[in-house]
């Protein structure tokens, strides 16, 4: 339903929460949002809920507040788990815990997280030795723990009051269904369940995976039935594929006082463009996070970006959900997201809590149909803007600069190649391939936007007919060295070993070939001596016979020399031979 909360409903909700929770809430928050009142009321009335609400609307508190009250009413023992919250990433889990913590401290409840990045044994030890009242977990890690200690987890979960699935639209893969089925087998059926997302939770059948019964639908929509906040302005810039990097950098340079978040398609892309951007943006604060960063590194980078006034963060989709940084001015998407719904989540990192924000996606000429696709499928309208300071000359100058950067360090050269490969692999898997297919992608242009010196061989590109348009660099890439002395020393050692092995292999092949030819000639010579024939011309037969005889003479000479060396011949015999 789409609704505005009236004063009576608001008053009733406040009364249901009780004074202790209200005391904590009123210290940190100004007022309740619609989604918090609507979903919270249903949960406190012991109904399951499916909640769709825009990013930045306060969805986390929408389940935290009723959850805390339900646990408070249940009067659990110190070791009883009263709530389980499943979220798709470590960052989201950390964000949720930070919201829960003040309320948990007030009620003397303990909160723990179970996510990837830690050893499973450590998680199991925590369950055995610690009291946990609220568990925040990623489904994959909880599934792993259940595989080891199902009885222990089932015993701990027997008092569960509420199951929350945060960012529920992300949980629609087959693997997740297997994980969810195992998790549900460990928790009581008599519980409440809440599904929360910024975009529509999938079909009715998908809800059965989560064990919902007669769920109440809560939909807090923005104008045009959009999942994006009304204070968010969405734009696109059309450019040639080979100019994307240049357009992105020029756009950032024009906005020296703005905080900007840029989404790239893969961890490899983030690593590569961080190296490029740090050499192109001067003293501008630059940060980077991706799924393969360590937890401490990610946390420190996110905090530093949050504290900055005009920082630039390069990221994968680990920053697309749940990371609450209120003052991001611009979100840039370097290319199409894997799923169109992710556009909404990415863009939702700006324009939070009523603040104005802007989102931009870089669209190559062959991708223009994506603009209408977003409007039709996600109700997101994009307006076109220009980047007037960019032109072909600047793009080529940047490409040459990027090449020099790669030549200065082999590690960056290799990072660029890996980034390009990951980009193509990611593009092949997005959900609008009917209108933006890999076959239509300007691969050569994309390679130039990465400033590649060589086009890597890829299965996805094996049938392309346009790759000969790529201008291969004359630079000998094998001579490019690592800037890191240890890496370069190791590379030289490996290259030397490979060269020696290659020489040995070639020598062995040559020896084998010569031995084979000798055996063949000897065999042919034997046939001629025995009066055999091969049906060849007389000249060829004579030549083969001559070679065979020469080979026999050579073998006789070798045997004779060996006998002389061993002293097997008398002086007279040696004289006769000579």
UniProtKB/Swiss-Prot annotation:
GO cellular component, one term: nucleolus
Region span, Disordered: 507-557
InterPro entries linked to this entry: DEAD/DEAH_box_helicase_dom, Helicase_ATP-bd, Helicase_C-like, P-loop_NTPase, RNA-helicase_DEAD-box_CS, SPB4-like_CTE
MF terms (GO), sorted A to Z: ATP binding; ATP hydrolysis activity; RNA binding; RNA helicase activity
Domain Helicase C-terminal: 231-393
Recorded catalytic activity of this chain's protein: ATP + H2O = ADP + phosphate + H(+)
Gene3D superfamilies to which the protein is assigned, alphabetical: P-loop containing nucleotide triphosphate hydrolases (3.40.50.300)
Catalytic class of the enzyme: hydrolase
SUPFAM superfamilies documented for this protein: P-loop containing nucleoside triphosphate hydrolases (SSF52540)
Residue ranges, compositional bias (Basic and acidic residues): 536-549
EC number: 3.6.4.13
Comp. bias (Basic residues): 510-526
Keywords: ATP-binding, Helicase, Hydrolase, Nucleotide-binding, RNA-binding
Residues that coordinate or bind ATP: 53-60
Motif range (DEAD box): 166-169
Motif Q motif, chain ranges: 7-37
Pfam family, one: Helicase_C
Span of domain Helicase ATP-binding: 40-218
Family: Belongs to the DEAD box helicase family. DDX55/SPB4 subfamily.
Known function: Probable ATP-binding RNA helicase.
Domain notes: The Q motif is unique to and characteristic of the DEAD box family of RNA helicases and controls ATP binding and hydrolysis.
PANTHER family: RNA HELICASE
This protein's name: Probable ATP-dependent RNA helicase DDX55 homolog
Organism from which the protein derives: Caenorhabditis elegans
